[in-house]
Amino acid sequence: MTDIVDVYLVAAGKYHDIDFARLELLKLLAAHEEIKVTTVSDYENIKEIEKCSFMISYTCDVRPSEGAQSSIRKWVESGGRW
């Protein structure tokens, strides 16, 4: 069995509907049995991000807070992929 790959998907937008893009991304990811996706609307759950191998973001005017930016930067520097 292939190892599970945890993915953190941030899909949200203030000014338009993100549902279509979110669904299409999930369909693409679902083609890979080893991928497990956590889908969220912001960047603030750093503990979950740190558990993941990589993060995908599809957003419109949704930004991480300064604290989340710092934590995400450390996560990327430690090998996390975004």
Predicted regions and their residues:
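Aromatic-Pro/Gly-enriched surface loop or interdomain linker
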Residues: 1-53
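Short alpha-beta junction capping motif
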Residues: 10, 50-82
